[in-house]
Amino acid sequence: MALERSEVEKIAHLARLGLNESDIPQTTETLNSILGLIDQMQAVDTQGIEPLAHPLEATQRLRADVVSEHNQRDAYQAIAPAVESGLYLVPKVIE
């Protein structure tokens, strides 16, 4: 599927791109090459191939899940203007 000039102009308009007259031929060529690549990928037979969440079968080294900060909720709420039942009270904004 090859795009024509009018289709590229329409795509540029919908994407709110300002293309100069001199840019349209190269943009058309670039979009056509992208669509060609998509056609090549769609032509590959993927029947029987299990989908991957990530193309590399690498495992990530994760750090240990340890507490690095202590709970300072009481200290923060002590300086808050209004607190009730552990929640910060704020002025009503929507009626």
Curated annotation (Swiss-Prot):
GO molecular function, one term: ATP binding
InterPro entries recorded: Asp/Glu-ADT_sf_sub_c, GatC
One Pfam family from the record: GatC
Subunit structure: Heterotrimer of A, B and C subunits.
Role this protein plays: Allows the formation of correctly charged Asn-tRNA(Asn) or Gln-tRNA(Gln) through the transamidation of misacylated Asp-tRNA(Asn) or Glu-tRNA(Gln) in organisms which lack either or both of asparaginyl-tRNA or glutaminyl-tRNA synthetases. The reaction takes place in the presence of glutamine and ATP through an activated phospho-Asp-tRNA(Asn) or phospho-Glu-tRNA(Gln).
Family: Belongs to the GatC family.
Protein's UniProt name: Aspartyl/glutamyl-tRNA(Asn/Gln) amidotransferase subunit C
Biological source species: Ectopseudomonas mendocina (strain ymp)
